[in-house]
């Protein structure tokens, strides 16, 4: 499991359940566990990247689900409403949970539970992993990246 620091205030399982209902989704259990332990934040021990055989990209921070630590930090709900509802540049079946250094989201697919990177500039949804657990397993320190 990953460790996040500089997290926002804790959320309860009840609060997570209410957000799932309001968005009409079910979050993966591993993602819920991260939000319950540390509500968003940056990865401990410096910069990290997701790396697979076909793709590599940095991870700036994991989005909090509620209760931001300070103003200017978007929550999952805020980011979803901005990109899906207001700007219509992200498919409604994607839930953002983290962002890269350019502000582009890593998302969980509501229909399949897979993890995607959404390149908003090029309008691309890049399939990364079949599930959140597999994605977490491929996060490495930046200095170990090839």
Predicted features by range, described:
Residues 117-118:
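Short, compact, well-ordered microdomains
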């Amino acid at each position: 499991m990953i460790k996040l620091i500089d997290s926002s205030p804790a959320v309860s399982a009840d609060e997570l359940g209410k957000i799932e209902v309001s968005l009409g989704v079910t979050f993966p259990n591993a993602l819920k566990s991260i939000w319950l332990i540390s509500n968003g934040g940056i990865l401990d021990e410096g910069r990290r990247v997701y790396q697979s055989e076909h793709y590599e990209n940095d991870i700036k921070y994991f989005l909090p689900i509620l209760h931001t630590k300070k103003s200017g930090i978007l929550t999952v709900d805020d980011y979803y409403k901005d990109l899906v509802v207001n700007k219509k540049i992200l498919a409604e079946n994607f839930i953002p949970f983290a962002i890269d250094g350019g502000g582009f989201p890593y998302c969980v697919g509501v229909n399949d539970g897979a993890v995607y990177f959404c390149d908003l500039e090029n309008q691309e949804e890049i399939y990364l992993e079949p599930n959140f657990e597999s994605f977490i397993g491929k996060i490495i320190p930046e200095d170990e990246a090839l």
